Amino acid sequence: MKYIVNFLVTVCLFMSMTQSANAQKDYFKDLPENCSPEKVGAILSRHFIPSKHMWYGKGKWIHYAEVCTWYGALRYAEITGDKQLAEQLKDRFDLLVTTEKSHLPIMNHVDLNVFGCIPLELYKITKDKKYLEMGLSYADTQWTLPANVTSEEKAWADKGLSWQTRLWIDDMFMITILQAQAYHT
């Protein structure tokens, strides 16, 4: 009996996954040409390059929403093989870390540390160690307790989580994307 139940559960799960995959596949099938994911991705990514920075902390540091946009544009360039776009995104980053260096986020909060996913993605594309070192420094500070740690932050660290853990959905993404990037490099 247990074998039959396990078999039926497996069949149901397989059918459910197959149906979900087919539904997702069909969703993008009939889009107008100008609305394809490739076209929209190219437009959004190229729009980002000349845009002004978004600021966090009264104009001090790059905002995490810009970081997420930048990361998405880099992933788009990598997936589509758009070397020109990747180079433009790299140039924007290089300008930030040289000419606009005062706007590099400090490493004391998840909203700021997520910045590290950009140099880590650039490292994956270019293999330039300067990007790896910068990105890993942002990732590593999520595990190093600061001198002024709060009891709540220490409690997260004592559970084996980053001291920057907060149970906000965007924070869960931001910690995960940075740590996943660090792991993959």
Regions found by a protein language model. Name each.
Residues F14, I125, L145:
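Phosphate/oxyanion-binding loops and surfaces in catalytic or ligand/nucleic-acid-binding neighborhoods
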Residues D82-E121:
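Mid-chain, structured segments of secreted extracytoplasmic proteins
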Residues I62-E78, N108-K124, L167-H184:
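Well-ordered alpha-helical segments within folded domains of soluble proteins
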Residues T141-H184:
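The feature captures the catalytic groove of carbohydrate-active enzymes
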Residues Q24-D94, D128-S137, T141, L145, ...:
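Low-complexity, Ser/Thr/Pro/Gly-enriched N-terminal "stalk/linker" regions
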Residues M1-Q24:
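Bacterial Sec-dependent N-terminal signal peptides
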Residues W55-G59, K101-P105, W163-Q164:
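A ubiquitous short alpha-helical element
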Residues L112-Y123, K129-D140, E153-D158:
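Glycine-rich flavin
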